[in-house]
């Protein structure tokens, strides 16, 4: 399947010369993601509180540091060695480092240097379509969603101006506006501040006025997705969060995790347990 494959480029109807792909799968091949997952399956961390998360060709190293640690430790060296042994080149320019620390007096994290190049330290990073910031406020993610929604209002208003049937307008709203708001919804919506939440609620209210019919509120959509996701975890023994859902001796209610901070209280597991117990 991989041996002797050729490829070429087409620009304005003209084709380039054929070239042989010597060490990669054909671009656009439906098997390429699966083959890459199989190839990188053995890349995993055995270090305590150090995890290597992979989704297709996106790889993230997550480290839980104690009060005296300021670096990822040996997991970085292990990952670089694995890349070298697996004939994979790490693009240092695209590699970013972000430290999430809620303490007021934050120690400066150690600088990461790979092949003589310093890895850029950032305050926010877009991972799998969602902006994460170093305080987990999701403000940048909310601003990005709001900006995209504003751009799509133009098309929705055009449909209203042309007196398109409300059924088609609702279909457009759910496909191009609601879908971008509710993407990875259960991860961040409950953690939003009132200002950011009102910003997204305004998108729904403006859309409802343009369509002429009220649309489902974001809180209702969030609870539906949260309930569905929590139930899927409860029926999947292999899910990493399965053990976080523990039933009380009565067997009818789940044990609510003790939350010292509002940040943890509004995170996924406590929110899901509260909803399931309601």
Label the model's feature ranges.
Residues 1-26, 63:
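Conserved pre-catalytic core of RNA-dependent polymerases
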Residues 59-84, 102, 137:
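Catalytic palm subdomain of template-directed nucleic-acid polymerases
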Residues 23-33, 65-73, 89-91, 118, ...:
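Conserved, non-catalytic sequence blocks in retroelement Pol enzymes and Pol-derived host proteins
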Residues 33-63, 180:
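Active-site palm subdomain of RNA-directed nucleic acid polymerases
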Residues 190-278:
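Short linear motifs embedded in intrinsically disordered, charge-biased segments
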Residues 12-15, 89-123:
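Short, conserved micro-motifs composed of acidic
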Residues 28, 43, 52, 57-59, ...:
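Mobile genetic element proteins and their domesticated derivatives, centered on retroelements
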């Amino acid at each position: 399947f991989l041996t002797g494959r050729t490829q070429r480029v087409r620009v304005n109807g003209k084709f380039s010369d054929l070239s042989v792909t010597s060490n990669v799968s054909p671009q656009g091949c439906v098997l390429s993601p699966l083959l890459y997952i199989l190839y990188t399956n053995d890349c995993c961390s055995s270090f305590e509180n150090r995890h290597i998360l992979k989704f297709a060709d996106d790889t993230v190293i997550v480290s839980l540091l104690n009060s005296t640690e300021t670096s990822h430790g040996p997991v970085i060296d292990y990952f670089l060695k694995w890349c070298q042994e697996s004939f994979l080149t790490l693009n240092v320019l695209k590699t970013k480092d972000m430290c999430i620390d809620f303490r007021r007096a934050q120690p400066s994290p150690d600088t990461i240097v790979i092949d003589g190049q310093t890895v850029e330290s950032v305050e926010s990073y877009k991972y799998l379509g969602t902006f994460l910031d170093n305080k987990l406020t999701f403000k940048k993610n909310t601003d990005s969603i709001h900006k995209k929604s504003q751009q799509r209002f133009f098309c929705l208003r055009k449909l209203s101006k042309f007196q398109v049937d409300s059924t088609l307008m609702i279909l457009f709203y759910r496909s191009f506006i609601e879908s971008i708001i509710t993407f990875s919804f259960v991860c961040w919506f409950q953690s939003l501040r009132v200002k950011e939440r009102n910003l997204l609620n305004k998108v729904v209210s403006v859309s409802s006025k343009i369509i002429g019919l009220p649309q489902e509120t974001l809180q209702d959509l969030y609870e539906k997705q949260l309930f569905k996701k929590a139930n899927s975890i409860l029926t999947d023994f292999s899910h990493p969060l399965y053990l976080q859902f523990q039933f009380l001796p009565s067997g009818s209610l789940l044990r609510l995790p003790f939350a010292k901070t509002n940040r943890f209280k509004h995170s996924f597991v406590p929110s899901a347990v509260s909803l399931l117990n309601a």
